[in-house]
Amino acid sequence: EEFAASPVDNLELPEGLFGTACHALIEEGLAGRPFALPDALAGQVPEGAKETFLAEARRLALTFLDSAFRKGFDSMPRRASEKGLIVGLPEGYALSCRLDLVFESEEEIVVVDFKSNRTRVPGEYDLQLAAYKTACRMLAPGKRVRAFLYWLRADRAEEVLREAGLEELLDLARAAALGPQDEAAEEEGPSLL
């Protein structure tokens, strides 16, 4: 599935920069702060592209912030952006996750993963979000856990129903440990995500 073209599609940008900028502006908006990119991000945007880049990142951030989907979680008392989780797996492995946005109540955890991609490939991120759900369940047993992809360009939430059991995650960890790794991965140890 192809989403509508964006003015940033033709800009020469470092990979992932636009999505990171959208996430940063969403985080600012959720915290009630004015939309401003951190200097570290703003400095990576080519000089002639800054106005277009920032306008489009703001537009997509507002799409989420103003959405009925986001407002549907206003009653949940706890919220965190860019939440890091590390949970232990058998055999000394660990599952490391960085959740874009998490809402939590006494009964439920809702994970939201933002995507600014132009193309949606069905199932492409299902295992990633299934692993996030497993990590949340391990850290908060008994709570209902749901996970959603939020396609910023389409203003659409998509619930990911796939589950990943502990054995599947352990199999992935074993495979990752056996496969080729770069120097940074060797220093950090096995990682699934």
What kind of region is each of these model predictions?
Residues 1, 158, 170-193:
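Acidic, low-complexity intrinsically disordered tails
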Residues 1-99, 103-105, 126, 191-193:
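Nuclease catalytic cores
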Residues 12, 142, 180-182:
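Anion-coordinating catalytic cores for phosphoryl-, nucleotidyl-, and glycosidic chemistry
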Residues 22-25, 129, 173-177:
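Short amphipathic C-terminal alpha-helix that caps PH/PH-like domains
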Residues 57, 61, 65, 133, ...:
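A generic alpha-helix structural signal
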Residues 89-169:
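Mg2+/Mn2+-dependent nuclease catalytic core
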